[in-house]
Amino acid sequence: YFTHKSSKTRNYSYYWDVENLVAHWVAYPLNDGLAGSGSRTDDWGLDPKLPRNMQPVLFRGFRGGYDRGHQLPSADRLTREANVQTFYGTNMTPQLGSLNQQGWASFEGDVRDWSRQFDTLYVVTGCMVEGSTKVAYDNDNKAVAVPTAYFKALLGYKKDLSIAASTAG
């Protein structure tokens, strides 16, 4: 797995699948200092942690009608440095536009809203590619597995409460 840091904090960590060219999971914290409705940089780039041939190249998006679906949403990172890292191909999966722009985007907003109830909400977003028979092609014509399912796991922390009380709800 790999971790991206900004100058002041750990941004996110992810577990990379070189064969399918997707992160099985991306883990990140949400709190007042990190999340909000930040402006998108749309600075699509290569992840400096991996060589070009081991990651999707997505300057122009996926071919075949798929959106570049963020696992760590761009809106969850306010600083330019942290936001740029959300546009690496290693944070993307091929998503149908209807899912990416509607249901999943709404769910991401719900998670941001829930994060306000805690000092920190720890989020793990992931995708499943087992059994996938579909691929999308990146700008270098590499095949990227299209996930068959997505998930989010959440853990809320409040410094004034016990662990059981922090995660209830």
Specify the residue positions occupied by each region the protein language model found.
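Domain-level detector for secreted/extracellular nuclease and nuclease-toxin modules, and
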Residues: 1-169
